[in-house]
Amino acid sequence: MMRRFILLGILLFIGVAWFVAGPAVYAAESIVIGVPTSLGFLEGKEAHKAVQMATSEINAKGGVNVAGTKMKLKVVATDLRDAAPGVPVPEALLGLEKIILEQKPAAIVVGPFRSEALIAGMDIIAKYKVPMLGTIAMSPGSEKKLKGDPEKYKYIFRTCLNAVHLVKYLAGSMALINKEFGFNKVYVMHQDVAWARATAGFVKKMYFDKAGWEVLGMEAYPTGTSDFSSALMKARAQGAQVIMPVFDMPQSGVLVK
């Protein structure tokens, strides 16, 4: 399913890229698809594989038809490391600009992992006019920025889950728990990154506060943290019936134990 979606997205973006780049794309031996993201993390690694599978399928059929000429696709990836602990946004932006300048991709897919990097990187995408199909970063901040200047950011698209919709899903889950078990005391633990802060804050504001839940605490954790014992002890001591975790880092799996 994901491969078919990526395949369709690539074909669509090739059309857009051809319209934008024109003769420059046609003169190349192959059409370069850039994949700048956090390759060391599951989401980035699997997304990169999906792009490779999709392009292999396209190339096996002869490539894509560009003005009557069949052209093969070439995938070029770079590890932005923006999801890794301690990596500043400017460092990730250097990687994004480097792949554009050195590899000259006709289009970019997947894109930055962390929302902070995506929002800041939108200006780089706009500067070089490279169409980008983002599939990971979730903060609604990128949409707000696009709406502020749609002409400037018209090359940027996002197909993944928006944190706003995740709020609705989580609120629905909490409502079900309340209905089925009568629980109404929650302890919130979230990663200290844009999408997770927004998600935790909006669930509290839009659901917990209105539905009469008692929020016993909200703890934010830097990316890479693996010790959650202090908050768990607080949650137990205060009588929490539900813990709502909002993370994307692999270390959060420790909470299951």
Regions found by a protein language model. Name each.
Residues 1-10:
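Bacterial N-terminal signal peptides that target proteins for export
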Residues 9-21:
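Bacterial N-terminal signal peptides
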Residues 19, 25-29:
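Boundary at the C-terminal end of the N-terminal hydrophobic targeting segment
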Residues 28, 43-49, 64-147, 159, ...:
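Beta-alpha junction/loop-to-helix N-cap segments that form part of ligand/metal-binding clefts
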Residues 29-57, 112, 185-190:
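Short beta-strand segments enriched in small/hydrophobic residues
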Residues 44-66, 201-208:
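Short, polar/charged alpha-helical segment
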Residues 105-218:
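Extracytoplasmic ligand/sensor domains, especially the bilobed periplasmic-binding protein
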Residues 120-129, 200-257:
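Extracellular/periplasmic bilobed ligand-binding domains
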